[in-house]
């Protein structure tokens, strides 16, 4: 199974400067956990201490926004994820 997670430049220092990391998993959450297993330094950049997605992390699965309560959504071979931080200000 090949699922790709696209890593933004500001998180690449935590993935050994990899822009794309291939992961395995049957759900979005499992794929994110596999990312953390391969790149442990990114863990606290996307999850809080309870293992919940940080509220400023945004995930897109094949171009579709995934809400924090949809992490159990199925993932399949060929999927591509994009991670982003949501920035605010005024």
Which residues fall in each region the model found?
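Ubiquitin-like/PB1-type beta-grasp interaction modules and other compact soluble beta-rich domains
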Residues: 1-89
């Amino acid at each position: 199974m090949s699922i790709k997670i696209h890593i933004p430049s500001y998180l690449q220092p935590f993935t050994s400067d990899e822009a794309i990391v291939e992961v395995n998993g049957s759900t979005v959450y499992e794929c994110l956990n596999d990312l953390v297993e391969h790149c442990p330094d990114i863990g606290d950049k996307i999850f809080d201490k309870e293992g919940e997605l940080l509220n400023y992390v945004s995930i897109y699965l094949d171009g579709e926004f995934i809400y924090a309560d949809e992490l159990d959504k199925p993932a399949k071979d060929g999927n591509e994820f994009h991670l982003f931080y949501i920035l605010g200000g005024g």
